[in-house]
Amino acid sequence: MTYSIFDREQLVIGGLNERKNKVIFERDMVSLLQKPHAFSQEGTHLIERTVERIRVAKEKKSSVMLTFGAHTIKNCMAPVLIALMKEGWVTHLATNGAGIIHDWEIAFQGQTSEDVRANVERGQFGIWEEPGFYINLAIIVGAYENLGYGESVGKMIANEGLKIPEISTLYDTTTQYMESDPDKAAAAIDLAGTIKRFGLKAGWMPIPHPYKKYSVQYQAYESDIPFTGHPMFGHDIIYTHPMNHGAAIGRTALNDFLRYAASVVNLEDGVYMSVGSAVMSPMIFEKSLSMAQNLKIKEGKHIDNHYILIVDLAESDWDWQQNGEPPMDHPAYYLRYCKTFHRMGGEIHYLSADNRDFLLALYRQLKGEK
């Protein structure tokens, strides 16, 4: 059968300087001094319980994982996320592909979030040169360097540029690793092809990021804390650019999934917080926990004393901890981010809250403030 393939080379790609953004970081950022809206008695108790469990996890050197959707970045929560990292309250951060992109755009230009409706109408949504070129190139270079998805972008932001290898070096790498590490050999070929196709020069490519102090993945890279990216093909604006390369996405995203799974292995007595992620977080967690349990069972152990808190705006009148899984004719059964996590054992709670209020309240209580 013959199928049509969309030719991205035919796209008219705009520059970010042409794009109007809805979020200006220095105008909209959430300050550590800002107070959250008041919670109900039940919500306050849940946050206190979470703080208690984080303190225990920190004492026992167990994982404290914070996984979130892109709106946590778009809501300018970087100051809180960075403080949680720097003060040792979280050991792993994870987001989807959009979260990586919004964080990069903030580091690169201090603003993010285009008008989707208007730009789709004019055939321009997501079709921008800088994020498409630089983020994809960072991932292609990162695949060659055996980095993770988030790590590749964080390194580019931290160094404010990328090192482009000589073509001859890449060909030598291909020959050297063809049998011992075919993935690395393939990544070298991919990078060589990209360099030739786009006419890139070997050596240092400067890419200024004047707002990098606001980047969560930059701060994670500098602090040597995993910030993993978990993209899905076709979900993000970088897929519109001809620089996009599926093999590099796959190699770096797989590295990040395995790093995420390694943190789940250390989740006994630990804490997992899923904030505003209806699909990505529960899906990668269930596979990772199964893998982790597999290893623990081999050692005669089991992960049982883990704490899970799910935070989302949607209201839920079902008590998952007390009532278990609802019947299939109940709407709560179809809340994937509750149902999946409830099947993962441990202690699980659901909190209906805005991510800004939750993270601010969590941080303030960890600091001993009200």
Language-model segment annotations:
Residues 62-71, 93-95, 271-278:
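Short glycine-rich or small-residue beta-strand-to-loop segments that form or flank ligand, phosphate
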Residues 75-77, 82, 86-138, 211:
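Active-site histidine-anchored catalytic micro-motif
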Residues 115-223, 228-229:
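Ligand-binding beta-strand-loop-alpha-helix segment within the catalytic cores
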